[in-house]
Amino acid sequence: MELDVLMSESELTLRPMTRAEWDEWMPRQLAGYARHIADSGAMPEAEAWAKATADTARSWHAGYATPGQLVFRIMAGDEAAGWLWLAVPGPDPDRLMGWVYNIEVDPAFRGRGYGRAAMILAEGEARSHGMTSLGLNVHGQNTVARSLYDSLGYDVTALQMKKPL
């Protein structure tokens, strides 16, 4: 299996971000989210920034300590190789789906199976919080991520399309 050759999840860990790391990460996360929205053609850049800002404020209503919002550094030994944002709702039995809001493997670590291994670790983290499924959104133009999620067994549950006139 390719994962065994490139990277096994046992060689990679997810470490909770420190407050200082979160403070550094949050502006980059917000900018990246706004850029993805605008790049998808869903809306102009100014509207994308407004949406990203509102969505982020809603998700992180209590800042770093917001319950159910988990952000990890993807660690390859002692080296930070990226980050992963996982949301797990409270113990409500009607809300047992965790959500991967974002994952990013740093450029120097790409192409080595780190994203795959981190997603497998995220599945375990979600299970440890009582989740029975894990969802995510992927922008249509992100073909590398779409291929990864397909190979991990994620099913398409919605598809949004647009045609410029």
For the regions a language model picked out, list residue spans one by one:
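Acetyl-CoA-dependent GNAT
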Residues: E2, L6, P16-D106, E125, ...
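Conserved GNAT acetyl-CoA-binding A-motif
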Residues: M119, A126-N137, Q160
